[in-house]
Every structure is written in structure tokens, then in C-alpha cells.
Amino acid sequence: MSEADIPDPVAPQRVTPAMRARLERIVGRAPEVMVKITGRTKDAGHLKSHLEYIMRNGDLTAETEQGSLMHGREGLKDLQLRWTDDTVLDDKRRRDGSVSVNIILSMPPGTDPIAVKDAVRAFAIETFEANHDYVLVQHLDDKHPHVHLTVRSQGYNGKRLNPRKADLATWRERFAGELRLRGVAAEATPRRTRGKVRKHDKGPVVALRRRGVVPDTDKGAREEVVRAAKAGTAGARPWEEKARERQAKIRAQYLDHARELERTGKGSDRALAMKVREFVAMMPDPETRREQLIRELSWMARRTRPDQDRAPNCGDTGPGAKTR
């Protein structure tokens, strides 16, 4: 739980300064940080290859938890030797255990890359310095300024790094906070806070769609929807009902905050309350991928029926339209 989520102990319904600041960022659509675990290295050879990749075979400089800068091919070799030697000595690692956890921290195009790297450095110090070796390398060959952070799984205390979903949420909050300290507008809200119920599609799937290729996952999802429709079992699923209930509560909470802001009588609070109401009004319909497919396939089925089977003068709303 972040400071912005902690209610006022005296007046629990009051919008605290931290909550107000976060509302400003959310309705102002501050850029969302990305903190993602890209993978884990499994052995010394895998680790060496990963370090070669993030350092571009020595063309990029790496920075360690001690602040040491590793330059060029020699720096890359020194880093590889140090980490692989430690891997051999790590007799507590299971044969299928990881050697490192590989993380990427990124911001949208146009973000100051110096601020991004400084924020990642501060994040790494606070999160890992006390218990883990790590190395960070910034990449500037992409429109999104980002830093690769590779952390040794084996901690100084003998415990292994095994981040969970809650850890990633904390890491996002921390990274966003470090960016704000450096003057960069940044937020780390969950998708559901922005009215989204669907997970982001994986990179390879998105790439296939851009090339006009239908991914196997899309084919399978469509086939499942068609089978369910034929069997008469295409109704709402329990998790979809829960998602809608959750979204209703989130939107109600936003409106509660808006009413509380309006009660203060301050012009700035009334202005923010109006923005909050507009934000809620613009939130997307909490539609899952399955529900979207059902709607699209239903529309396509109506379009392909003979003209006499369609009601006259009713007009087509299309797969993306909403009826009143």
C-alpha cells in the first residue's frame, strides 16, 4: 500500500494531500512506468550471453551495485568472470534454479533518459543493494528510454530473489516515486484503476497482428467462442461478473473522492472534482477479450444473414459501436 492509498486516521473519508496529488496525476494521465521481469538466466553460459546482450558486447558501459563502471570488452569479461565464478561456488542453487533475475525499467518516448537512469540507480540501491549483486545498463537505441537491471538471485543472506506480483507493484511505485523526485511526471497505477480489465497482449502476438497474421491465440479464442455459442454456453463467466463488480466499486470510489473535494469549497478542489468526474465518464467499458469476440462475431453473423432475415430500417451499429 502506498502513502496515497492510506486514509486519514481522523477522518477516513477525507482526501489526504497524498491522495489528492495522486488523483491529479491519474486524471491528468501522467505517464505510466514499466517494470518488467524479462527472464532469468539458468547457468553460467546463459548469464554470459545475457551480459553480452545488455552490454552490446562491451560497447555499452555497465554499472555495478558498488558504483563501479565496467567499460568495453575487458569490462564485460571482468563482469562475466566475477559472476560466473560466484555461480560455480553457489552450491545452494538447485540445478533448475536461476542465476539472475533480469528486469527492464522503461518510460514512454520523450522522457529525459538521464532522469530515467538516475531513478533506476536509486531504485536499485533501495531495493537490492543491501542483499544482492546487480548490474545496470542503459539502452538508448529505442524510442522508449530504458535500463536493463540484472540482479544476482542468490542474496548475501542466503535467500534467493523470487519476486511475486505484489513485489512488482511495489517496484513500480518505487520507480515512479524516484522519477517524480527528479521532476518527471510518472505514475504506477494498476490497469483496473484506469478502467482496464484486459491484460496487455505479449509482444510477439502484437507483432504478428501488425503483420496481418492471425496469432494462434486469437484463432483458439475465436474457436472457443464459436463452440460456446453453438452449445448455448456463451453467457457471462464468473470472473467477468467479478471484474464488472470491481470496476463498479472503483468508479464509485472516484466519485466519492469527487464529492469530498467539492465539499471543501475551494476552487482548485472543485476543478479537480470535475476532472475526476470526466475521467470516470471516459473510462472504457469493462469488457474482456472473450466478450469482445462474442460481440464482434455476433455483428459479423448479422451482416452475413440474407436481407430478408434482417429487420428493415434498423441500421448496423458495427462491432465497435454501442447502442443507446
Residue map of PLM features:
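N-terminal nicking endonuclease/strand-transfer module with a His-rich metal-binding environment
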Residues: 1-324
